[in-house]
Amino acid sequence: MKYLRLFIVLLIVLTGCCASKSGNKNSIHTFKINSTGELKEFFSYSSDRIPFICAHRGGSRETFPENCIATFENTLSKVHAMIEVDPRYTKDSVIVLMHDPILDRTTSGTGRVSDYTYEELKALRLKDTEGNITGHRIPTLDEALEWAKGKTILVLDRKDVPIADRIKKIEEHNAVTNAIVIAYSTD
């Protein structure tokens, strides 16, 4: 019974959060974090906060492809969320956002991401969750890090980009207050 009450309270809180901004389509929910101390405090446990939401691959849905900046905007227009992204290397060592190592499922292209240069990938378009080709292109990690400033926290998964390279990108963009990395081991 205790868990049922907690679930109902959380559902009401989350429904209120989602509904609070729905009237203004230009408004997005943002996290304003200005220092690493504030980021640490943000992730510290507090019993009076609503649960964290992390939008896997950015919160893709029909007409909104995964790992796409327009999708991130759409997600934040509905709810406060961190955005999980999937960095991958191109043939010319540009880091783009792409979950799969193969382009076929999520883009108008075929083959391996790592077999294309970034210039070649720019000609491709992303597919939505229904497999429809959209007008959206594959973003770079650089673009996502710049976009996220003052809006949200990017959660950088590993894929084929080592932790040191992800951290280097975060530092290059002065994004230490709005990006974190996923590590699958301490090695």
Task: List where the protein language model places each region.
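Phosphate-group recognition and catalysis centered on beta-loop-alpha active-site segments
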Residues: C17-D187
